[in-house]
Amino acid sequence: VIGRLDEVVVDCADPARLATFWQAVVGGEIVRQSGEWVAVVGPAQITIGFQRVPEAKAVKNRVHLDIAVDDLELAAAAAEALGAQRVGAPVPDPVGGFQVMLDPEGNEFCFIVGPTLVEDDSTAE
């Protein structure tokens, strides 16, 4: 092991706005707030940092967050009320499904339903 994951960082134009959005989506509390940097520590003790950068988002994310929910439609509607947008229709799969979303700055994320790796320890070694 070389190191440990400390946090996931999102480059953005408005750290406070995105932190408030993501706190409403995943829960937790806002910590380490400055004009250039805001972080949210979620209930699972995963930290999402939001860092101000001068350039706008230009291409599709290479990494995205999957957020486990009980109901895709309810979650998508609640996120839309906070400024998110849906990307297409929900996508079914054999064990559940997912809805691709954009946060208020256009970063992709997914709401997922069905078994998750956190709940399913059969993949643990």
Walk through the language-model features, giving the residues of each.
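Vicinal oxygen chelate
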Residues: 2-10, 31-32, 39-41, 46-51, ...
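Short, solvent-exposed beta-strand edge segments and adjacent coil->beta transition regions
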Residues: 5-7, 60-64
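Short hydrophobic/aromatic beta-strand micro-patches
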Residues: 9-11, 66-68
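Amphipathic alpha-helical segments
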Residues: 14-29, 75-81
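Residue-level preference for nonpolar/small residues embedded in alpha-helices
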Residues: 14-15, 71, 98
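A short, compositionally biased
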Residues: 33-36, 73
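Short connector loops at helix/strand junctions that flank enzyme active sites
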Residues: 35, 43-45, 58-62
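Short, flexible, solvent-exposed loop/turn segments with mixed acidic/basic and small polar residues
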Residues: 52-57
